[in-house]
């Protein structure tokens, strides 16, 4: 079984944890811009251990595109790894925003 949902399989939820130098480098704002441009809803936040968590819902293809840019990040970031999984979208979000715990 693949970690990627089949294209055209409707809305899904992506939960990702981004590891590396991802705090203090504009990573959350970068994710916000990308997610809004892709029409996704959800949030991004810093974790106390230095990682960044992303929870996004939307079209499968757009989530996969967001996942690809999470591996890159903004210029000042250094992404070491991205752990992620997909699940069923709940539709609970109306927009994408930055959360502060």
Question: In which residue ranges do the predicted regions lie?
Answer:
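Intrinsically disordered, low-complexity, mixed-charge
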Residues: 1-101
